[in-house]
Regions:
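Signature of N-terminal electron-transfer/Fe-S-associated modules in redox systems
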Residues: 1-163
Length: 163
């Protein structure tokens, strides 16, 4: 059997759990997470790394999983949208999206939320400009971004109150 036709084991941590995935050498991480790990919250929008719908965190960095060969996940720590909330409550960003109507059709929502969570982890009280820059890799065709932006601003207030 040719090398490219054989699946290879990929060991990584996904949402806090040690995981072994099996993937063909050029399988996209997006597909492996959705189909093999059952983590369907991560969406495919464009499939070209332009829209951010497929965003995940890998070792703390926001990456487009539609462009990432699954083999590159070896030894990494990955967080998908399913790993953002804890067992008892939503993350402040998720709660703010609910309260402020930051989601409509839902395709961009997981990537937007992960981008905002990633931004707040690095910069708990970002300026408006930093929020816009933090969300710049994510496209939305429904909301016009106002509700998304308001949601992130509200999440910043929520994290400030808890600090």
């Amino acid at each position: 059997m040719p090398e490219a036709a054989r699946k290879i084991r990929v060991r990584c941590v996904v949402n806090g759990r040690a995981t072994t995935l099996e993937a063909y050498p050029m399988a996209r991480l997006l597909d492996v997470l959705r189909e093999q790990a059952g983590l369907t919250g991560t969406k495919e929008g464009c499939g070209e790394g332009e829209c951010g719908a497929c965003s995940i965190e890998m070792d703390g960095a926001l990456v487009n999983s539609c462009l990432m060969p699954a083999l590159q996940a070896e030894g990494t720590s990955i967080r998908t949208i399913e790993g953002v909330a804890d067992d008892t409550r939503l993350h402040a960003v998720q709660q703010a999206f609910l309260m402020h109507g930051g989601a409509q059709c839902g395709i961009c929502t997981p990537g937007m939320i992960l981008a905002a969570v990633n931004l707040l982890a690095r910069k708990p009280q970002p300026t408006e400009s930093e929020i816009r820059e933090g969300l710049a890799g994510n496209l939305c065709r429904c909301t016009g971004y106002i509700k998304i932006f308001e949601s992130v601003v509200e999440a910043c207030r929520g994290t400030e109150k808890r600090a």
